[in-house]
């Protein structure tokens, strides 16, 4: 079985959960006894064992959605000879769709997010958002199977695309490598990042995008006790305007309280893991989140999580056992910020309870979210799709 994996992100150019997912899924698939043969195709220059596909020269100044389609055309041509194509995110869905039409091979999509649920992407793509939405819809309706990364995501897929046969939409959870993400206490690393390891702190890790809800967290921080810290590991802004909004809010917060640190970078794992481990609480204020792999990473590091109760997050954060959930209502941002502040304050004031939740979170990761099981389940979807074509 020869599988063509298509992804926009591939190490070292990984900036979001979808890229992390593809990296670990490919490694786990390759580790399976008698597993499939994989050809990885990524956007950009060739790297590692992936075939890179830079944006075609005539499209270098074009809208980002047109650049993606130009790259997808080249990838689709390179997929001749695959038995099945598996694409990740709308950026790559076009390549899978074209390969399916031109080469007659089945196409499997992993749903990491849905364009209609992310209208703010129009700020990044402009008119290209209409093309990204059309690409996703067309690819999903034509796909042989759709893999949702959570039960909540499956419900979302069927709600947004009701024409899809529910039997074609499968749940295969996202995962985390518990060896790569494990409790690592290193006050020196934390201090080297400008964070006081002796001050209890809440930690946010994520991209600067409307989806991640960072402005809500900054509003909540105004209500936190004065003796605790807030660390924001946030970069890769969708737009300059979003970055500036965060910069202004952080500067205002830093002027009013101590212990607010903004690390404007996506840290390497050897720095990120000690930073997560050292936090009393990890906070995920997302307003939209199909699963939230970052919450699994925090749990694997033994850190309690406070998160919004949206999308697939409640399937990852066991409320009251591995963390605390906060209801999100788009019409009540002040209430959401107050809820975040209250739950964060609970755990920051009770480090023993937070530590117990963190230990329970790691235990759950070890039992339910390993990559070997995810890879096995993915190959079962491949086999079922290929059998249906015979």
Give the positions of each predicted feature:
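N-terminal subdomain of nucleotide-sugar transferases
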Residues: 1-47, 372, 389-390
